[in-house]
Swiss-Prot record:
Binds 1 pyruvoyl group covalently per subunit. Its cofactor is pyruvate. HAMAP family: PS_decarb_PSD_B_type1. Its EC number is 4.1.1.65. Keywords: Cell membrane, Decarboxylase, Lipid biosynthesis, Lipid metabolism, Lyase, Membrane, Phospholipid biosynthesis, Phospholipid metabolism, Pyruvate, Zymogen. The lineage of its organism: Bacteria, Pseudomonadati, Pseudomonadota, Gammaproteobacteria, Alteromonadales. This is Phosphatidylserine decarboxylase proenzyme. GO terms for biological process: phosphatidylethanolamine biosynthetic process. The modification Pyruvic acid (Ser) is found at residue 253. It catalyses: a 1,2-diacyl-sn-glycero-3-phospho-L-serine + H(+) = a 1,2-diacyl-sn-glycero-3-phosphoethanolamine + CO2. Heterodimer of a large membrane-associated beta subunit and a small pyruvoyl-containing alpha subunit. The gene is psd.
């Protein structure tokens, strides 16, 4: 009965209004009041602050600065093996596996449309049909920056307006098409394993989603899908190395990553498994592997310089290369 109530209350809650109000409070710099709420959050969710570059709650001028905190360089290491794709986030695997034509598995009894997930654009979805996907949930205690599973060059970004349902496991099991209904940002990359789509899914009280190349992408400016294309062969091209920061959530959410058919094989992962940034997620299929001998090395995770963690400011560039609304 309680679970039913938790799910169905979301249909009548003013989720966008609530999220924007919480977002404003999370950005506010309120001194000791901010510190009090950060300490309360750390205790409630058992956040491991020994991994944070700045361990003391008093360091963070706003709640969002705490929530998007930088980790110590040695806290995570990137598997640099040529044939390995890494986990992009700290989180929990919700689902993973094959994309069946245009259908992605969400939970028992629920699938959602690949095309709808990617903004309702068949040409964007086409490369990923019958490919692979992985959905990873970021809990409140997790590190909330998103990194690249493999090196890639940004080709397109879409902002897709939508609902802001919670994305926790209970909601995923009960709300049809959840990840294709919620507000989201889609980033498309050319990579050594073909096209890759990184979908950053918003949720209740997720005040905004940011990327390292465009700054804040949400809150939105309208109710239509917006599409930006990017140069790939000029000095202005956005090229990100494996393990480089891609973006961040201000309050937690979910990512869905999609790959083309016959390009990758998932490693030993399963629904419910806890993921750590930098650890192996998948490998290139045999036909995609380099002929040169494999070399396995590890390097510390480096946060992007696009964000100023001390000043409390983020890059304010607007998405470029021709918005298509």
């Amino acid at each position: 009965m309680l679970d039913w109530l938790k799910v169905n209350l979301q249909y009548v809650t003013p989720k966008h209004l609530l999220s924007r109000l919480v977002g404003k409070l999370a950005e506010a710099e309120m001194g000791s009041v901010t510190t009090f709420f950060i300490k309360l959050f750390i205790k409630q969710y058992n956040v491991d602050m020994t991994e944070a570059l700045h361990e003391k709650p008093e360091h963070y001028r706003s709640f969002n600065k705490f929530f998007t905190r930088t980790l110590k360089p040695e806290a995570r290491t990137i598997d640099e093996s040529d044939d390995v794709l890494i986990h992009a986030v700290d989180g929990t695997v919700s689902q993973f596996g094959d994309i069946r034509s245009d259908s992605i598995f969400q939970a028992k009894g629920h699938d959602f449309s690949l095309t709808t997930l990617l903004g309702g654009k068949p040409d964007v979805a086409a490369p990923f049909k019958n490919g692979k996907f992985a959905t990873v949930y970021l809990a409140p205690r997790d590190y909330h920056r998103i990194h690249m599973p493999i090196e890639g060059t940004l080709t397109d970004m879409l902002y897709v307006p939508g609902e802001l349902f919670s994305v926790n496991p209970l909601t995923a099991q009960n709300i049809p098409g959840l990840f294709a209904r919620n507000e989201r940002v889609v980033a498309l990359f050319d990579t050594p394993v073909g096209k890759m789509a990184m979908v950053l899914v918003g949720a209740t009280i997720v005040a905004s989603i940011e990327t390292v190349w465009a700054g804040t992408v949400t809150p939105p400016t309208g109710k239509t899908v917006q599409h930006w294309s990017y140069e790939t062969d000029s000095e202005a091209a956005v090229k990100l190395e494996k393990g480089a920061e891609l973006g961040r959530f201000k309050l937690g959410s979910t990512i869905v990553v999609c790959f083309e058919k016959d390009m990758i094989d998932f490693e030993d992962i399963a629904p419910g498994m806890v993921t750590r940034l930098g650890e192996p997620m998948a490998s290139k299929m045999s036909s995609q592997k380099a002929i040169t001998p494999e070399q396995t090395t590890e390097t510390p995770v480096q946060a992007s310089n696009e964000f100023d963690d001390n000043a409390g400011e983020t890059k304010k560039d607007t998405p470029s290369e021709g918005a298509d609304s």
